[in-house]
């Protein structure tokens, strides 16, 4: 018998042994199933039950913890659960209206408001110096502009330029009924050319 045959026989015996142990554990009458321990089992104990873990002292139970009730109602044995509210109520007062009372008087609060300090340096350019000073020449300006000259136009369109002449253009004709007179055609320059053409579409006043 060689070495390979011995190894195969030992492996078969080991497998048969494991199968037998598994079959034996499954056929036991009082065999308990495999149970995994719950890591939160110690925190599931209630203070009202029979079992209580002493390590869970930091768990807060509202029905058993009365250390944080700070409301005093005037009696020695009567305590009101108000969830850590530091409000002292006299006997016979309504607890709901206890927080609505003003803390300070409004007259005392006016004294606590800081006042705005006045600027130490005066203004370099006050508003009174920004306007021109009154002068007698400006006060007598009404003598040079009487009321009868308010609607008078002192500009004459035909005074400085000729009307109906060759060199006139009369672009700003204030007193003409027509737009402007006919621009005459005159070839000027070294090549006898001009860029200004006569207005041949100008209609006469009567015609």
UniProtKB/Swiss-Prot annotation:
Record keyword DNA repair present: no
Principal localisation: virion
GO cellular component, as recorded: viral capsid
Start and end residues of each stretch annotated as Disordered: 63-82
Keywords of the record: Capsid protein, Late protein, Virion
Residue ranges crossing the lipid bilayer per the database entry: none
Compartmental location: Virion
A Pfam family: P11_C
Induction: Expressed in the late phase of the viral replicative cycle.
Chain spans, region Hydrophobic: 7-23
Record's comment describing the protein's domains: The hydrophobic region might anchor the protein in the underlying inner membrane.
Subunit structure: Interacts with the major capsid protein.
Function: One of the minor capsid proteins that constitute a network internal to the major capsid proteins and outside the lipid membrane. The minor capsid proteins glue and stabilize the capsomers. the p11 zip protein binds together the neighboring symmetrons.
Record's protein name: Minor capsid protein P11
Chain's gene name: A352L
């Amino acid at each position: 018998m060689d070495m390979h045959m011995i190894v195969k026989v030992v492996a078969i015996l080991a497998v048969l042994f494991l199968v037998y142990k598994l079959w034996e554990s499954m056929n036991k009458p009082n065999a308990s199933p495999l149970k995994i321990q719950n890591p939160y089992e110690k925190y599931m104990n209630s203070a009202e039950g029979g079992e209580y873990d002493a390590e869970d002292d930091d768990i807060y139970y509202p029905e058993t913890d009365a250390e944080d009730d700070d409301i005093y109602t005037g009696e020695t044995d009567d305590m009101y659960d108000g969830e850590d509210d530091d409000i002292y109520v006299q006997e016979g007062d309504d607890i709901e209206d206890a927080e609505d009372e003003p803390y300070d008087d409004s007259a005392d609060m006016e004294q606590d408001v800081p006042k705005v300090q006045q600027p130490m340096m005066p203004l370099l350019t006050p508003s009174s110096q920004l306007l021109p000073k009154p002068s007698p020449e400006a006060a007598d300006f009404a003598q040079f502009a009487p009321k009868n000259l308010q609607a008078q136009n002192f500009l004459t369109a035909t005074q400085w330029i000729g009307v109906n002449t060759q060199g006139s253009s009369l672009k700003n004709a204030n007193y003409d009924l027509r737009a402007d007179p006919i621009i005459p055609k005159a070839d000027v320059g070294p090549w006898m050319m001009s860029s200004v053409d006569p207005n041949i579409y100008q209609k006469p006043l009567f015609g």
